[in-house]
């Protein structure tokens, strides 16, 4: 039997996690000089907004106020991931460090949501979590590709060139 009574807690946790991720990617984008990495961070921030909205639609609590105000609220600077980013920004290789932090966070999110989805009874809420897991897996692949590019490794955009030569 699933833990339906915990669904609102799971949604609350997911909403806060997505807000933290959105803030992280916005801050990373603002601090990044590499045009390609900046675009990746902007794309990820916008996708986190979509995740946040999806979870918010099913959340019945009033802890966050209205969606617009919550999204515009200042970032949680006590969040460990945000603090790690701020520390990384002071270094010369902050794009690399930000991508490494992002990889860890996306992987953690995939693991956490995959565990939660197993206990969700409501098919609509379950579908939201499943969709977000798939999209987060795509985020991980995108970040991994950008990390390889920043580190001057072969990435997906270069693979065709190397195969043909």
Each language-model region and where it sits:
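Iron-associated oxidoreductase/ferritin-like identity signal
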Residues: 1-165
């Amino acid at each position: 039997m699933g833990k339906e009574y915990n669904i609102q807690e799971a949604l609350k946790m997911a909403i806060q996690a997505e807000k933290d991720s959105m803030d992280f990617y916005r801050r990373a984008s603002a601090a990044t000089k590499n045009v390609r990495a900046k675009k990746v961070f902007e794309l990820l921030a916008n996708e986190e907004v979509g995740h946040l909205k999806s979870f918010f639609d099913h959340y019945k609590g009033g802890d966050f106020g209205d969606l617009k105000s919550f999204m515009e609220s200042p970032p949680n600077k006590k969040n460990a991931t945000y603090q790690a980013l701020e520390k990384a920004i002071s270094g010369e290789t902050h794009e690399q460090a930000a991508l490494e932090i992002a990889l860890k966070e996306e992987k953690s999110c995939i693991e956490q949501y995959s565990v939660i989805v197993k206990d969700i009874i409501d098919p609509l809420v379950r579908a939201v979590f499943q969709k977000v897991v798939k999209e987060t897996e795509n985020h991980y692949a995108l970040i991994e590709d950008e990390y390889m590019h920043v580190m001057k490794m072969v990435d997906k955009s270069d693979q065709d060139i190397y195969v043909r030569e």
